[in-house]
């Protein structure tokens, strides 16, 4: 069966970038169609990414906190985990959110076509779905087709014991021993979940630190904590992976590499993601796709074809949902005739581990690369009353300032709920705040977020909660 649709805007992909673009188009009075390969809206993020991982991380955090309370006189005993019930709860979270999106699409009269969409011309798209073929004729298109996990040719990905992030989130079993390939955000988050559920976790990372994008001093605080949970093998890489009946055997080389191949019950490959740009027949619409699968756009999210836009993971790093959402708004607004641009000063990044690692703006590494003279100020959570009282004193808040103007240009927080505390730093950078602005803003006490104000006081030399190196000597 074949059907044909005519619309003002078609959005290819219904992840956070895609559905945000589609809903914004509808709100601006544009007839809009979404094409989505999943049976529900939300894309990778909501169905097999950001949201289910946070649901499982919440479970992991509660398990770890319950164990930690034994030192303070409250003993719950060993937790008994029922992974079927945990999985059911995770699916309930997803269903609630996807149902909400479906309701909003219906309320906005956004038509949803399920299936795999590919371009057949500059103004036509063909969708192969369970109910047959749908041809969509459009005036404007927004490509929001996302990304997928990287696969390496020497790894037997077809073996059910070799996982990508989607497999790990299915929570089919809890392996006794698990290897995480890649010390980035996804791998560390999944390692956190499975460690809490009882797995022995090894992490192999080719760089000299996990979370390579963050500054060393920030990661050092994090690493000190997670070494109690994970066996970290830094400056080490995997050279061979062999599937045998009794396990997955992994050979490594490097600074921390074991001499012999190691046997694992599961191997999580979390070495990054690749864009889906080559899977869309975009060339038939005249859209240029580079060798890696990325689609180049301008600040209005236009591709080289003026009426076709691209947003989200497919346009480049960072591959983050919140970046894609804002790009989607811009694309929709430009199509509607508004002169809007995607020009953020900062895009925050967060590892939702325990402790969380969050940063926004320039890191020290980036400031050096740009030739910017800067100074840093840090406030250790070991001096925070709220952190000590909450048993999370192994954290740190760091601010980076322009040396001449004293404006904040970057910041990082490592500690419990660090991602929830990062917003003030991002807003401060967007608004052009300097150290004095932050230091003179009265922060509630005792809180974790007051550490941002206290870090600014360290820079200003007005700190009284720490020894003051800038105090005048008598």
What would you call each of these model-derived segments?
Residues 10-12, 117, 136-146, 180-181, ...:
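Short hydrophobic core segments
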Residues 13-16, 181-184, 313:
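Glycine-rich Rossmann-fold phosphate-binding loop(s) that bind the pyrophosphate
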Residues 50, 145-200, 204, 232, ...:
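Glycine-rich dinucleotide-binding loop and its adjacent helix/turn
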Residues 158-176, 262-335:
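FAD-site-proximal beta/loop scaffold in flavoenzymes
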